[in-house]
Amino acid sequence: MKSASSSFSSVIIVYVIVVTVFVSLGVFVDGREFEHGRAFGRGSSLKTTIQTTTSEEGQQQRHEQQQQQQQQQQLRASSLLLTRAKEFVLKSLGGKLNKKGTDLEEEEKEKETRRHSSSSSFTSLSSLVSSSLKAIESRAELREKFRHFVSVQFPEKKKEYERKTEEEYEKRMEIFHENWKRAIEREIDDRKGGGSAKHGVTKFFDFSEEEFREQYLGLLSTSTSSSASKDAFRKHQMEAPSDEDLEKLPQYYDWRARGAVTPVKDQGQCGSCWTFSTTGAIEGANFIKTGKLVSLSEQQLLDCDVGCAPDIPNACDSGCNGGLPSNAMEYIVEHGGLDTEKSYPYKAYKEDTCRAKEGKLGATISNYTFVGKNETHMAHALVKYGPLSIGINAAWMQSYVGGVACPWLCNKDALDHGVLIVGYGEEGFAPARLHKEPYWVIKNSWGMGWGEEGYYRICKDKGNCGVNNMVVAALNE
């Protein structure tokens, strides 16, 4: 932290020195000319009245005019130089970079900038030790905030709470308070990791950590699930990309801009995240092959897929009780495809009967592959194969509101949620890097009312929350 702060301070000092020198010459940061002595003002043209009473006086005044013109040219050159210096410093602080990549990549960058324009481009030193949430100071304040949570922020909860006993109401209010305090801690933790994420009140604030995990997560949390079955991994391991392939990777990439991502879905209170992570990857692979975006059936996987991972005890897909995307893709390969969402709609619970034969086939895959932990290789796989199905530790997501999350204390091995990587980019100033912070764009399955319209951004190249521990790509060759 000290080294990051000193690096930040050094850049600021350089900037101040540059500005001071040029302001003394009569030039402001944005290139506007101020008074230099009393020769000229901002926006004024040099006006010289040449007296012609004598030849000597005329020569003297012409000489003064030439000097003033030279001074004006020097100041303009200084202004240009200062602008270049400012651009250099702004780049160091995370300002606008030079344009790179294709027109489409630049368009994606501009969309990302507009989408997250409310996020600060700089991380202030004070934000490293504070949270945007304030501690609740009294019982009365807690009651008011909880009432607002139930009645105003999430009015769909109002009827539910009208049926609760006073004892249950008090219990939920205490859980709300614990989540409030935890959100403050997590935002501070994100700052320590170099992130810009905001944590606040979400629809999950009246769920304990255990309830949240049971009802909204669903990736099988076995000790070996992060590396999948050893036999399966060897059989399906992706070949490492060449250096030439990696050099060609674009700076920004987003499958949403290319039309390969369906709208954000909502799994409800069912641990079916693994099915949404799976269908998202196959929807993308199918789009790359056919040019058509077809929403696929999560319900078919809930009802029909009971496959198990070899060599992993209790790693069998089990409806709302959890599953693994690799198991699901194995089922889809063996079954011959996956039905459309329309023909086999989602119900948020497992039915007793598999109705796969009754539905309309929406997409097929030829195989799947495990991507290694190298996040540059992950970016290559994303660009080549489409959106990636991954596992993640979702503890910090319960209170996530927006921004780039870089959880410092998030356990990388405790994967409990299946999500979908759809792109990557970079934004803002990172104290530890002195340049923009790279991030993954993740599609979640908790509806558009959560996070950034249903999406989550997390630091790239750091392995935060195990984002690189279980990565699967669908193949459609």
Give residue ranges: language-model regions:
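N-terminal secretory signal peptides that target proteins for export/translocation
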Residues: M1-S7
